[in-house]
Structures are given as C-alpha cells and as structure tokens.
C-alpha cells in the first residue's frame, strides 16, 4: 500500500528536456487543431432577384459548419423568394468523414499527451527503468506521426472542396438560378481562415511528432546499449561475470 501511494513523485525536470518540452508543444498544437476545425461555423449567401424586377435583390443563405455535411445545409430565406421553396435546395458534398477523422484524432492525441506528461513528470523513474513503457511510447509516436500526415492531407483536400462548394460556383449549380424567372448573383461566404490554420497546425503536429520520435527512441532499449557502453567507457571496464 505504501509503495503504491509513494510511487507518484512530482519531477519537473523532464519538462526542461526535449522529451517533455516537445510533448507540451504537441499538447498545445493538438488543442489548436481540433478547436479551429471543430468550432467552425459559416454561411454562404446568394442574391436573388425575380424577373422582370431585377433591381430588387433578396438574400438567400445556407449555413454550414463542422462536420461539414454540406448536403444537409439547406438554403434559408425570409419568404419563398420568386416562388421557390429554397429549403428544398442544399449545398453539394459531404466532407464529414475527413473532418471527423481529423478532429477525433486530434482529441485522442490531446488526451495521450496528458497521460504521457503525467507519466514523465510523476513517474520519471518508472518510465526510464522500464523497457516496455518507452517502447510503447515510441511506437505510438511513430504511428501518430503517420496518422497526422494522413488525417491532415485528407482534411486539406476536403477543405479545398468545401471552398469550391461554397464559392460563386453554387450560382451555376442551383436549379432555381437556372430558371428564366430568377436571376442569381453570388453574395458572400464566411472567411475560412481558421480552417486554414487547422491545416497548418495539422502539418505542424506531424513535424513535432516526427522530431520527437528521436528523443523517445533514445529512451528505449533499442538505443540504451550505446548509452550503457558509453558509461562503461567512462567508468572503466566491467569485469566479466564470475570474476
């Protein structure tokens, strides 16, 4: 009972080393990744006028956001502009799989960073004396680096398609805008700067995790023999067993 209670010992030294310091950066970057993507809400507007009175424009709006199921984002108007039921018309595309994969993975990374930092700071000796924990940490780090590349690339492609689907191109694709009784002009679309930032942080995370892989590797048994040899060389030759 006493051993279990005294096992946790606060040691902030690992936070000053690359292993712990980079993990803090990974934790912060993960927060920015899922917050900038998962918290986005925007809208795109088109201006509609009814012929022959084309001087009077009315606004029709489609609101969209995470997880970016644009095919469920219907257009809304104060009334049936030009006799059209705009609610039955939606944007094009479903990009929820890429967006949710990216955000969900970022949340898991966020949680793992907390667990890893707790291990580094509270159980420093347990981590460094164990052969399994550093190896597990190293494998997770390598896998996370790869998944950051995959998830961010998929999300970047989806973001490009989202920008196209909410751009002036929608005027050409909306069926009511093709009718002779209506005239449509693109109005505006919410800036997607925060989504661009999410992509940047995704690739930044990949770089951080890829770089940190080396420092995690140095804690594993794959690298420890070289450290052991170095320490033996400084302290003198170790006699063979039995002598």
Description of each model-found segment:
Residues 1-27, 115-144, 214-233, 239-242:
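Helix-loop boundary elements of multi-pass alpha-helical membrane proteins
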Residues 2-124:
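N-terminal helical submodule of small eukaryotic multi-pass membrane proteins
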Residues 15-28, 94-115, 133-150, 191-211:
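Physicochemical signature of membrane-embedded alpha-helices that form the seven-helix bundle of GPCRs
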Residues 36, 147-161, 212-215:
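C-terminal TM-helix exit segments that contain a strictly Trp-centered aromatic cap at the helix terminus
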Residues 39-45, 123-132, 157-163, 192-195:
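Membrane-lumen (extracellular) interface motif
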Residues 51-67, 152-195, 225-239:
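Juxtamembrane loop segments immediately following a transmembrane helix
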Residues 72-76, 120, 156, 163, ...:
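Amphipathic alpha-helical interaction segments
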Residues 83, 138, 182-184:
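Short, motif-level signal for alpha-helix interfacial/capping segments enriched in acidic residues
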């Amino acid at each position: 009972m006493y051993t279990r209670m005294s096992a946790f010992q606060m040691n902030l030294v690992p936070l000053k080393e690359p292993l712990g310091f980079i993990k803090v950066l990974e934790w912060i970057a993960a927060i920015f990744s899922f917050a900038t993507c998962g918290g986005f809400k925007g809208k795109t507007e088109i201006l509609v006028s009814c012929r022959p009175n084309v001087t009077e424009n009315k606004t029709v709006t489609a609101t969209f956001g995470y997880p970016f199921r644009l095919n469920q984002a219907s257009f809304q108007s104060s009334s049936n502009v030009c006799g059209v039921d705009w609610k039955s018309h939606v944007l094009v595309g479903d990009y929820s799989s890429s967006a949710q994969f990216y955000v969900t993975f970022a949340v898991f990374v966020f949680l793992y960073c907390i667990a890893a930092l707790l291990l580094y700071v509270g159980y420093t000796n347990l981590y460094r004396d164990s052969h399994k924990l550093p190896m597990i940490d190293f494998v997770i780090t390598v896998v996370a680096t790869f998944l950051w590349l995959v998830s961010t690339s998929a999300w970047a492609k989806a973001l490009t398609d989202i920008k196209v689907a909410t751009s002036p191109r929608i005027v050409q694709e909306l069926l009511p805008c093709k009718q002779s009784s209506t005239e449509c002009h693109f109005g505006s679309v919410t800036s997607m700067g925060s989504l661009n930032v999410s992509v940047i942080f995704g690739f930044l995370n990949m770089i951080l995790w890829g770089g940190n892989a080396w420092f995690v590797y140095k804690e594993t048994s794959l690298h420890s023999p070289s450290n052991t040899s170095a320490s033996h060389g400084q302290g003198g030759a170790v006699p063979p067993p039995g002598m």
